[in-house]
């Protein structure tokens, strides 16, 4: 009897702890809706992670009839070569009330062009404007009056 109670308590604690487990970048990559990663369906993303975790360099077909591959994974970040000319990086960021998911997509034009979007952990809300301010020209230019004349 005591053994079954102890087993039930341990199972409950494990379940309780896993309910609050930290979201990983791999989980976010798999669970992202198609609106976030339109080139890859969920099964393709699962395959890509399996290939990467298995040490394979196998690429997966994407919706543009090209190929995509996971190139790096850590608990906090995942990097994906989406096409020959684009990448996607996802990072999970612990916050006070939720884990945020930052998605940075980059297109390799002559000067790489990136876009960052920050989502709630369930991807239900775009939180970019509340957690990130785009730099303005003034942020990049110094005040000329503070420079010494040469």
Model-derived features: where do they sit?
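Sec-dependent N-terminal signal peptides
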Residues: 4-14
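Sec/Tat signal peptide C-region and signal peptidase I cleavage site
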Residues: 16-21
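Terminal domain-start segments
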Residues: 22-93
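Localized chelating/binding microdomains
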Residues: 24, 34-37, 124-128, 135
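Short linear interaction motifs
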Residues: 85, 96-103
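Structural signature of eukaryotic scaffold interfaces centered on beta-propeller domains
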Residues: 90-96, 149-150
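Mid-length scaffold segments of soluble, non-membrane domains
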Residues: 100-133
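Short aromatic loop motif centered on NTY/YTY
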Residues: 127-150
């Amino acid at each position: 009897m005591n053994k079954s109670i102890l087993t039930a308590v341990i199972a409950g604690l494990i379940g309780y702890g896993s309910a609050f487990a930290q979201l990983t970048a791999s989980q976010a990559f798999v669970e992202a809706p198609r609106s976030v990663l339109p080139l890859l369906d969920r099964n393709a993303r699962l395959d890509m992670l399996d290939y990467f975790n298995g040490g394979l360099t196998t690429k997966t077909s994407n919706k543009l009839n090209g190929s995509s591959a996971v190139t790096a994974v850590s608990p906090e970040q995942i990097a994906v070569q989406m096409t020959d000319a684009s990448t996607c990086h996802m990072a999970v960021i612990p916050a006070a009330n939720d884990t945020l998911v930052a998605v940075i997509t980059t297109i390799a034009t002559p000067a790489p062009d990136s876009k960052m979007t920050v989502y709630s952990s369930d991807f239900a809300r775009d939180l970019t404007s509340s957690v990130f301010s785009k730099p303005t020209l003034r942020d990049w230019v110094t005040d000329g009056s503070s420079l010494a004349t040469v």
